């Protein structure tokens, strides 16, 4: 089994291409994951799609063949040539894949380093795949460890202190352009997490908000939190509103644009629109009085954020490196523990068999049975103590697979008999004890 991650992000793929690769946690994601795990080289899969990245987190039998199949299917889905997809992709295998996953979950690979949205987005992607039956033991282990790593990074560094997000970066950009936003009015389209964060940042600066959403009841319930600073309108009024206000922020998660050029009326005042969605909500067009900012246009603020957090990022990378090593040590110990148990069970079974035989032949009085059992039990525990310790030590070394397979062969231990499924994510229940 191998871990494989294929990544398209703000680092290697422009926003127009990311739009074509984007998925939502719906029918398209389900259908794509079903095709992937049906392939004989792919065991499990998780699909992460956000405004800044599309990543395929896989457990595979053969990385090269699994990756090739993924590229074929992704080309069919996106209508992007397979060769271009291969050239753009960042591909990570095994240790590299786990390290990358931990970096992503800890927000070190984010456009805005230290933002906390990505961990929640990964949890949603994991839950979607798990509930759909597209991932099980192997990826569950990696994901649970990733979440623990991200928590450790947050707790042991200040990388998420006063975090900058795409939402806060867009509001900061608007403030840089327009100055004090107090008393101004901005339109916010959609009520997803990004829109909610944007509204919180705007109202904190004293800016009033007109929230445009299809579900007015849900929007009105959210608006109540802001004491009259947020009013709600339905989508039919969007065309009218965007022609009367200078600020607009959109993050709907729709698979198509919701604001088109033909909705725009000529006005004398300048307008600033922030498209925080991928795929983009706003149709790309040229205008002398409207400036449209997409996610990738916030790089200046992001770079400032990076420099401020550079020292904390170094500490975070150290934590991630340690967690990556711990993860593989833990995986290897999982494969050893059932073998040790099987060895002890064999010794116990042989001892009990001989005791029963001795009693039946009159060599041993029945009343001595329990005492002899205890003596023999202590004897084989003593005998197996050193091999057990040595096997656990070897399990942390590169050659562990060869040694473990040899032990299984010597003792006649069958893989099916180990019941490795029982060991699904033991780290969740034992790590706290180890950390204490």
UniProtKB/Swiss-Prot annotation:
It holds the Pfam family GlutR_N. It comes from the Bacteria. Pathway: Porphyrin-containing compound metabolism; protoporphyrin-IX biosynthesis; 5-aminolevulinate from L-glutamyl-tRNA(Glu): step 1/2. The record marks 100 as: Important for activity. Signal peptide: none annotated. It catalyses: (S)-4-amino-5-oxopentanoate + tRNA(Glu) + NADP(+) = L-glutamyl-tRNA(Glu) + NADPH + H(+). Catalyzes the NADPH-dependent reduction of glutamyl-tRNA(Glu) to glutamate 1-semialdehyde (GSA). This is Glutamyl-tRNA reductase. It comes from Wolinella succinogenes (strain ATCC 29543 / DSM 1740 / CCUG 13145 / JCM 31913 / LMG 7466 / NCTC 11488 / FDC 602W).
